[in-house]
Amino acid sequence: MNPIVISPAAIAAETDPIGIGAGTAPPGSYVLCVNLDAPTSMTIGAHGTAVLPAGGYAYVGSAFGSNGLGRVDRHRRVAMGIHDVTHWHIDYLISHQNASLTAIVVAPGADIECAITSSLLSRMKEPPLEGFGSSDCTCTAHLFISGSVTHIRNQCSTVIQELSASSN
């Protein structure tokens, strides 16, 4: 399960290498890499109002339903303002005007959402909002912050690569 870094533009053009945009993607785990341009106050569902610092964010998720990693295309459409339903915690962040979805790191076929989270927790600052994205598991949070979106994307790719090596 080598990590695959995909741009939102490739998904929109249906040219991504695993078929997310074409609706033929397999199930797997993913990390949304988000840049927040400025400190931002926002209401996040039941969490209430939170102030998030500017920087690079990584949101860890998984998609094992009938549409597989096609869920990532929904996130892309929310980030672009094409789909305006806020269903998951991450929707509040990626739909904010100060946020931009810059890349998606995927691990097709791998159910490693919480393993990615655990590894990132040991490498990154504490999650900025406890419980964010982790209401269906025992993880502290599924959202992590770093100084830059490039750094966080590279960390996520490294984590997935290491998890792959340790499972072989």
From Swiss-Prot:
InterPro entries: DUF123. It holds the Pfam family DUF123. This is DUF123 domain-containing protein HQ_2548A. It comes from Haloquadratum walsbyi (strain DSM 16790 / HBSQ001).
